[in-house]
């Protein structure tokens, strides 16, 4: 299934983060972590001007609406909620 965002919306795929390990050797499960704040743009709406598909972007941990499609988590956010683009 493909998600096509409308107007100024952007679909972001969460970055895959490795399982975090504490200094004491305890692995922290995903449910105990905060929402990721970095992801890759996979689709953009017709009014999006600043980002393009493939960009890695930063966003606030409470931005947008989280959805799950085919066991993959995505975030649909407004372009204005994107804090910055990570340049390589």
From Swiss-Prot:
Location in or out of the cell: Cytoplasm
Disulfide bridge map: none
Pfam families: Cpn10 (PF00166)
Keywords from the UniProt entry: Chaperone, Cytoplasm
UniProt GO MF annotations: ATP binding; metal ion binding; protein folding chaperone; protein-folding chaperone binding; unfolded protein binding
Assembly and oligomerization: Heptamer of 7 subunits arranged in a ring. Interacts with the chaperonin GroEL.
Record InterPro entries: Chaperonin_GroES (IPR020818), Chaperonin_GroES_sf (IPR037124), GroES-like_sf (IPR011032)
One BP term from GO: chaperone cofactor-dependent protein refolding
Source organism superkingdom: Bacteria
PANTHER family registered for this protein in UniProt: 10 KDA HEAT SHOCK PROTEIN, CO-CHAPERONIN GROES
Protein name (database record): Co-chaperonin GroES
Cellular component, GO annotation: cytoplasm
Family per record: Belongs to the GroES chaperonin family.
Function description: Together with the chaperonin GroEL, plays an essential role in assisting protein folding. The GroEL-GroES system forms a nano-cage that allows encapsulation of the non-native substrate proteins and provides a physical environment optimized to promote and accelerate protein folding. GroES binds to the apical surface of the GroEL ring, thereby capping the opening of the GroEL channel.
